[in-house]
Amino acid sequence: MVTMENSDEIMQILERFTDLKQKEIPKELEEYLQYVAKTGDTIFKWSSLKYLFREKLLSVIKHFNEDSPRLEEIPNYPNVDPFNYETMKSSLLERLDLFNAAPFTVQRLCELLIDPRKQYSRIDKFMRALEKNILVVSTIDPGRKRTESENGDSLDSVVNGDLSMEVNIDIEMENNNGNADEGSSPGAGSAGCAQKASCPRSDDNDQPKAKKAKLEIDGEERSEASDETDTEVATRVKNEKDEKNDNDETDSPHEAAEIEEPDEEVDEADQETKTTKQPAYGSQKEGEQEESFPSSADDEAEDPMVSKSIEAEKELVAQEKKREEDKKVAIEPKEEIVKKEEVVESDKPDGKVAQLGDKAVVKKSTPPADGENQEPVKVKAENEKEEKKHAPIKTEKQDDIDSTETDDAPSAEKPAEEKIASSESKPKTKSEDDPEAETKKSQPEKTETEAAEKSVSDEKQAAEPNAESENRNDLTTSKATEAAQESVEKSPVEDASSPAVEDLAAATTPQSPLGAADSAAETPPAETGDDSQASPLVAAVTPPVLALNDQPMEDTPAEEEARVSPSATVEEVVMAESANAGAMATEEAAKDDPAAMEIDDTSQEVMMQ
């Protein structure tokens, strides 16, 4: 085992070798190189060692090249530059001269120089290994001690220089410096440690808080509830809910409002049909189908609302309903009116009656050439503004009228009297709203009062002798009135709609004077009495079958006037407001069936003539 107990003697020998530029390396210096290969400690400065390493390198390469196979036998590799002994030797020597201190690979260099053939048999590989260890930049200072194992091998040595030793040195230096600082000023050292410990802790605590705040702004507010007071959480939740409500209500305020009201109205219609207990299976099925669509749409509209479970949302939706009640009517499609008229026609029982109804609709659809229907349309458009207020009262009166249809004949006069009383209680407000109607209808007052007196007497005469024919036609009248009632309950808002919808309904079902005369000529007295009993203000929904009664047609003009009688009696009570009272008397008729509007038109047209 090589020891450096005689380091002074080796230093003298090294200086003599460097000064004399000797070519042969003495034995003591060979032992020194073995020591460096074992420990990695150069002991001496690099300036005194440079010549020794240079001469040792040249001698080893020379002997290795002489003993190795010829250079011509060395194969050429595509990924490696061709080997040239002279150029590589000169480059290694130049690079070795550039070091100002011992390279950190000095231990590996010494190993290669001591025993060159231990790991390499070809000169090219050996010289490339030397090149790897010389083409470095890092250097080390002398005086470093290395640990040795029991068998003499260095534990810190590596194949291509000791890189781990460099790291260990840095750690030891830091530890030594820290120990020195602590020894010199223990109080200051402890304070510095406390500051170092406190700073990263504060940073670590601040960063998670910032991240937590970002996450909670996105949507997880419950985790923050323990830190904040209840009032702050409540205000924040309300603000976010208001923003969500604004976004949701701008998208579907009209849909929710339009869907919910028909659902409630259809529910009321089902309750009223249960009280009447009349068999109308086709109309009930259609009512259920129409009920299913808005109810399902209503559920779809309310599902996100329920999932959020927000009370403020419901309040805002209720306020939106109140604000947009006036706008709902204009938004509803006009096609529903035509569909419901077709539903009423499809519910008629007999095939002949349906055919006659189709003919009557064709006749009614032809507008009059003289333009006489324009005035009734204007009067209706002005009167429809107040129909919204009185719609619930009139639906209750219609229920009373339907319940009295199955009673005896004398009960037919009661609905007419109730309607006359209701129309008498309302004329003043309507006359104020409709000054134009008063100016238009001021001329034919005398003829209207005369027709009204005749119509009351004819109505009483027609109702008494026809009690027997009433029992036969209960089924037809009950079905027709029930279908009309469903149409009223499904679209009360539609009948009391804006003037644009009103004009569409009036244009689809106007009745010319000729059509009114034809329908009057086809009705026998008994059937007309029955229809007047069923609905005094409404003419027969369908022209009756002639086979039921074969009585002579003597009183058809008087019975035609009987259809006009409700409006005429109202005009008799209030002379100055005849047009408005007549229109209000026919409001229920307009809701019951499209034919009601037609009768109002024909009554006013006959009076004008």
Curated annotation (Swiss-Prot):
GO molecular function, one term: protein phosphatase regulator activity
GO cellular component: chromosome, centromeric region; cytoplasm; nucleus; protein phosphatase 4 complex
Pfam families found in the cross-reference section: PPP4R2
Keywords: Phosphoprotein
Biased composition regions of type Low complexity, renumbered to the chain: 183-194
InterPro entries, sorted: PPP4R2
Record-listed Phosphoserine modification sites: S68, S223, S226, S252, S603
Sequence positions bearing Phosphothreonine: T602
Region feature (Disordered): 175-569
Comp. bias regions, Acidic residues: 258-270, 401-410
Family to which this protein belongs: Belongs to the PPP4R2 family.
Job of this protein: Regulatory subunit of serine/threonine-protein phosphatase 4 (PP4). The probable PP4 complex Pp4-19C-PPP4R2r-flfl (PPP4C-PPP4R2-PPP4R3) is required to prevent caspase induced cell death (in vitro).
Subunit record text: Serine/threonine-protein phosphatase 4 (PP4) occurs in different assemblies of the catalytic and one or more regulatory subunits. Probably part of a PP4 PPP4C-PPP4R2-PPP4R3 complex containing Pp4-19C, PPP4R2r and flfl.
Protein name: Serine/threonine-protein phosphatase 4 regulatory subunit 2
Organism: Drosophila melanogaster (Fruit fly)
